[in-house]
């Protein structure tokens, strides 16, 4: 039987879902312009690097922390990790991009569901206390829908893989079939990544590969571009 609650969360994983993810490459465009990423093989290497070295240690750990804070009704912990998500994101374009995507996701979630936690989260932003982040909103939505933390993380990883692959299809460019082959290969990597996220300590939060951040920063100086970040 189909689990409709999981499907409701998976709706937010659609690469065409209007959060603005299609406008952000998170530094990939810099690698493409340098021809470091130029085909399916080199894109997969970059995608592994992004998922393993940046997303895992920022969004991934934060989602686990937020989920348990929701269970324990710990608002201070949510505000703390949300602030850390924002300040540890040093590249300006990716920091602003995450804020914009988080704001759009929260507004869409509130249009579709009556979640007290997401409404509280949105109110914190309206009161100028925080910036909104998609990883926090996605976790709150999954919790509201009764989805387990393991599945929430899996879906979020898939959403990032899918949207970045569609962006690579446009930018490198790759064929649509090649893009689907990338997603198929990366799906096998999701479970391993989630296990790693669940095993990490909170002190590991914020670790990332300097090369990724440098290329995200250097994207600010790219004059001919497809993406905002």
UniProtKB/Swiss-Prot annotation:
GO terms for cellular component: cytoplasm. InterPro entries: UreF (IPR002639), UreF_sf (IPR038277). It is found in: Cytoplasm. Keywords: Chaperone, Cytoplasm, Nickel insertion. Its main location: cytoplasm. Required for maturation of urease via the functional incorporation of the urease nickel metallocenter. Belongs to the UreF family. Pfam families: UreF. UreD, UreF and UreG form a complex that acts as a GTP-hydrolysis-dependent molecular chaperone, activating the urease apoprotein by helping to assemble the nickel containing metallocenter of UreC. The UreE protein probably delivers the nickel. GO terms for molecular function: nickel cation binding. Signal peptide: none annotated. Coiled coil: none annotated. The keyword Chaperone applies. The gene is ureF. This is Urease accessory protein UreF.
